[in-house]
Amino acid sequence: MEAFQELRKPSARLECDHCSFRGTDYENVQIHMGTIHPEFCDEMDAGGLGKMIFYQKSAKLFHCHKCFFTSKMYSNVYYHITSKHASPDKWNDKPKNQLNKETDPVKSPPLPEHQKIPCNSAEPKSIPALSMETQKLGSVLSPESPKPTPLTPLEPQKPGSVVSPELQTPLPSPEPSKPASVSSPEPPKSVPVCESQKLAPVPSPEPQKPAPVSPESVKATLSNPKPQKQSHFPETLGPPSASSPESPVLAASPEPWGPSPAASPESRKSARTTSPEPRKPSPSESPEPWKPFPAVSPEPRRPAPAVSPGSWKPGPPGSPRPWKSNPSASSGPWKPAKPAPSVSPGPWKPIPSVSPGPWKPTPSVSSASWKSSSVSPSSWKSPPASPESWKSGPPELRKTAPTLSPEHWKAVPPVSPELRKPGPPLSPEIRSPAGSPELRKPSGSPDLWKLSPDQRKTSPASLDFPESQKSSRGGSPDLWKSSFFIEPQKPVFPETRKPGPSGPSESPKAASDIWKPVLSIDTEPRKPALFPEPAKTAPPASPEARKRALFPEPRKHALFPELPKSALFSESQKAVELGDELQIDAIDDQKCDILVQEELLASPKKLLEDTLFPSSKKLKKDNQESSDAELSSSEYIKTDLDAMDIKGQESSSDQEQVDVESIDFSKENKMDMTSPEQSRNVLQFTEEKEAFISEEEIAKYMKRGKGKYYCKICCCRAMKKGAVLHHLVNKHNVHSPYKCTICGKAFLLESLLKNHVAAHGQSLLKCPRCNFESNFPRGFKKHLTHCQSRHNEEANKKLMEALEPPLEEQQI
């Protein structure tokens, strides 16, 4: 109706708003305004259809807001809108129809769920209702949709498991099918979910025996995604149904989980505001399934994990696939942590109140379900068995988790103690190896809370890690390490992490020792800790050994301040990554020891020089002075002959763009000797300045104009930046800031120095056809092409010579 009114209104006004033009009809005025006053296009009511035309000033183009139609002529877009986007009545009808179509399916699915829900206790009813809203709208959330929507599966699962498969099967049919039609992007997911749900019901009669379901399901998870979904569903079914006597527990757990997936309050709000499309619950069900899986099967673990990313290890171990969606998952658990304190006190209160209960009951349930589903070696081995998924996932997971973590840690500490404590009683089998609450506290929690939030992130991770580590039988540790390595965020963590795993197995004292002298830890204590623990951790241990191998190097330098420590670690981590590749085969303790020693002896010097060289100015200065002295004695002798060339260079250096690598430090020293007047007249440097002038300082002597650079000191002609830099070095005695500590060559740019230093590390490149050797791949490549062509010419000559004599003989 509004559109109709708008149509009528303009018909009354036939004058242009911006000039004295008067048109014969509304369309005439519209086209005049769009053509003559395009800048007001955005405010115009195009054809009575609203602000449909957008004018792009930079390109002088008119765009239709409803589609991608674009034209330079306003009239074209105007007619396009009136014809394609139709009269307002059609336009108004369309949205209504679409809305009806979209909302119907949304409404209908909830009904099945509520119908099911009546079968459950009253508590579940309300929860599903809540979750349904969050779901409906939540699933729409773009990235987060998986998080909110996961609620759906919980609900269906819960009712399903408690109620019976019959109810569940109806759910899949109406719910996913309609969403499938509605939700455009994720219909495929919804369909799989249907299948998975239909599959799940099959286990669901027996899911009450979570144990049988979970191991198979976990193995299934490895087999392929759909089975995974099935596997998770069974698992969710399993534990919930197992704890079905405690339906409140379930009610509590799914509810918190609800918010947790919807975790961030904003997401839930937006979730609600979002369109009905959310009925991607069915799609969401795919990620969610395994969320319940963590929510329930790892429940014992989850108390503690709730506090730390560790929990997410447990979850994923259950199935590699979770890693794919794990970012959502991880944030899920993280967010529960958040909701606990702030976001949804409602949901979370149930959990704490229930927490001692659920955690214990679930253990009672879980002792079975745990032993069978999570602990059963088959299930656990299989999940970790796919390290690829782990490795692929962790980075993302880590990214999400760490980002959230600082806040969470702040909020969580209160939660953690409760959760932690319930945790240990939960599954004694798993927890006890972890070192019992006391052990874990000394090893991690108290110290950790003292540590910076960052360290808390990981150390809690490490704390939970012991549990999940042992339960996941070594798959997790290395993966964790790898995941930590993948991100630079955790400079100091690797170490804190290491102590974490080792601490639990050792006495609390040992753990605390490890925490305090992180840097001075001997490799032995950790090795015994890690190697004996899970035999499978041996490979992980080797990465740790590697870490240690490189950490000792930082120790040498990092013994001074602690700030360098983090920097060094980050760098040593890079090195560690290299080390990881090189040392993958080193699994045994002895090999690790040997590697540690070797690396301590050999690599620290190079690595630290290479990686730390640009960052540590002190080192540079010292090296500089010593190298100056050495060079002045040794290289002047060698380069007497070069002096003449250098003098020649001085005169022509303005025009020539000398290759950066060709300027030897010795030559520069020579230059200093040969052109003292210039240096006096132009710039007086202290030794320190000579030793270290940054690129920015060099830029002070250079001005830019019209894309070229000029020397500010003299009036040389405009040149490229590199040429001016060389002019400054050669003519005006401005020292190159970056010098190679190995050979003394100086470079104007840090990147060039890095390349040069890297070349030192490489073995000499030798030409197969002649005696040419080079450290520099670029020059060597040039030589090869040259040598090859020369070689080909020679070969051709020989061939010709060989062919010529027979011809001569024939002529004779």
UniProtKB/Swiss-Prot annotation:
Residues 271-490 are annotated as: Mediates interaction with MAD2L2. GO terms for biological process: attachment of mitotic spindle microtubules to kinetochore; protein localization to kinetochore; protein localization to microtubule; sister chromatid biorientation. The modification N6-acetyllysine is found at residue 490. InterPro entries: CAMP, Znf_C2H2_sf, Znf_C2H2_type. Phosphorylated by CDK1. Mitotic phosphorylation is required for the attachment of spindle microtubules to the kinetochore. Its main location: nucleus. The modification Phosphoserine is found at residues 87, 108, 173, 184, 204, 214, 217, 244, 247, 253, 264, 275, 282, 286, 297, 308, 319, 344, 355, 376, 382, 386, 405, 416, 427, 432, 436, 443, 445, 452, 459, 462, 472, 476, 507, 512, 542, 572, 603, 615, 626-627, 632, 651-653, 675, 736. Residues 451-590 are annotated as: Mediates localization to the spindle and the kinetochore and is required for the attachment of spindle microtubules to the kinetochore. GO terms for molecular function: zinc ion binding. Keywords: Acetylation, Centromere, Chromosome, Cytoplasm, Cytoskeleton, Intellectual disability, Isopeptide bond, Kinetochore, Metal-binding, Nucleus, Phosphoprotein, Ubl conjugation, Zinc, Zinc-finger. It is found in: Nucleus; Chromosome; Chromosome, Centromere, Kinetochore; Cytoplasm, Cytoskeleton, Spindle. Required for proper alignment of chromosomes at metaphase and their accurate segregation during mitosis. Involved in the maintenance of spindle microtubules attachment to the kinetochore during sister chromatid biorientation. May recruit CENPE and CENPF to the kinetochore. Interacts with MAD2L2. Interacts with POGZ, CBX1, CBX3 and CBX5. This is Chromosome alignment-maintaining phosphoprotein 1. It comes from Homo sapiens. The gene is CHAMP1.
